[in-house]
Design a protein with these regions (language model features):
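N-terminal DNA-binding recognition helix of tyrosine site-specific recombinases/integrases
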Residues: 30, 38-48, 63-65, 74-109, ...
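Basic, Lys/Arg- and aromatic-enriched nucleic-acid-binding interface segment
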Residues: 80, 84-86, 103, 108-158
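Conserved tyrosine-mediated DNA breakage-rejoining catalytic core shared by Y-recombinases
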Residues: 118-121, 125-127, 163-201
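Catalytic-site neighborhood detector that most strongly recognizes the C-terminal catalytic loop/helix
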Residues: 122, 183-187, 220, 268-293
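Short, basic (Lys/Arg/His-rich) helix/loop patches that form interaction surfaces
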Residues: 137-138, 207-213, 225-266
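C-terminal catalytic core of tyrosine-transesterase DNA break-rejoin enzymes
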Residues: 149, 153, 159-160, 246-271, ...
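C-terminal catalytic core of Y-nucleophile DNA break-rejoin enzymes
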Residues: 184-203, 208-229
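C-terminal secondary-structure termini that scaffold catalytic or DNA-interacting sites
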Residues: 294-304
């Protein structure tokens, strides 16, 4: 950042433009969109709270970020987790400005906040069967449902599916098909063997996407809109988005079936197993299975 970027909006705008140039290199498009959204809220906040279009970096105090945080949650009605992610972006830009010598101190350095840990949403085994077998009248809804199911049976997230090519589908020495790739988000390597259900979906839509892609992926908003209608038809009241498919694979199809966490971590393309532990939710079925195993091993040792 050059010396002339000494006001908050200018610095933030410059950083956001720089992110755009780095898309596909070391930053994702979703990161750029998030910073663009934060910039829009920041401009609105300055107008709302101070009747300003911009503010000098030297005039920033901790009270600024405190008021901005409250503004995001009250005026913008953002959930606590979303508001914290926006605060992360503002904090990052101000920290970079301080490190680059544009301000003598970081006024936000001591501001403490934490995002609440929200439970990961996933479909249970019963819900997954209902979701899979429910007859849908709309061809669009059926296609969007099948994309979601493919993600459920392979763990591949939306962006990785968007760029999934037929060249990534490789047979092993016994003829079983595998997907090999690197996650767009982290660069971490992942590898997943095809389940029969996923293979049927791949064959169903083979040749329908522009070469060399495996699927023609609609926008996430369009798929999620369809998922809301489908889950309602299936009698599922929870809010299900496309990313819930990845959670379903990890929790319902793997961890609930006794697959080791380290193995699931490799399939998900996580660089650290602590990331995978977020998915390790203990379900009632897992508890019941654990008690059954304890009972089997103890036999009648402690019977009255």
């Amino acid at each position: 950042m050059g010396e002339r970027y000494r006001t908050l909006v200018d610095v933030f705008e410059h950083y956001t433009n720089d992110l755009f140039k780095r898309i596909g290199v070391d930053r994702s498009e979703s990161t750029w969109w998030r910073y663009r959204a934060v910039l829009g809220h920041l401009r609105a906040f300055l107008k709302y709270e101070y009747n300003l279009h911009d503010i000098p970096l030297l005039e920033l105090e901790q009270s600024f970020i405190e008021q901005y945080h409250v503004y995001l949650k009250t005026v913008c009605h953002l959930k606590a987790g979303s508001a914290c992610r926006y605060i992360d972006c503002l904090n990052n830009v101000v920290r970079i400005s301080f490190n680059n010598g544009l301000m003598p101190r970081n006024p936000f350095a001591s501001y403490s906040y934490s995002a609440p840990k929200e439970p990961r949403t996933f479909l249970s085994e019963k819900e997954l069967r209902i979701f899979q077998t429910t007859r849908l009248k709309s061809a669009k809804h059926e296609y969007h449902r099948d994309l979601f199911l493919f993600s459920c049976f392979t763990e591949i997230c939306y962006k990785d599916m968007r760029y999934l090519t037929c060249e990534q589908i490789i047979p092993d020495t016994e003829g079983h098909l595998w997907i090999h790739g690197n996650r767009c988000k982290t660069g971490g390597e992942y590898m997943v063997k095809f389940l029969p259900a996923a293979l049927r979906l791949l064959e169903k839509y083979r040749g329908t996407a522009p070469s060399p892609l495996a699927f023609d992926m609609p926008k996430p908003s369009s798929i999620n809109c369809s998922l809301r209608r489908i889950t309602k038809q299936c009698g599922i009241s929870r809010h299900i988005t496309f990313h819930a498919a990845r959670h379903t694979f990890a929790t319902t199809l793997c961890l609930s079936q006794g697959i080791p966490l380290s193995t699931v971590s490799k399939m998900l393309g996580h660089k650290q197993i602590t990331t995978t532990q977020i998915y390790a939710q203990t379900t009632p079925i897992m508890i019941e299975d654990a008690i059954d195993r304890v009972e089997s091993r103890l036999g009648g040792k402690f019977a009255a």
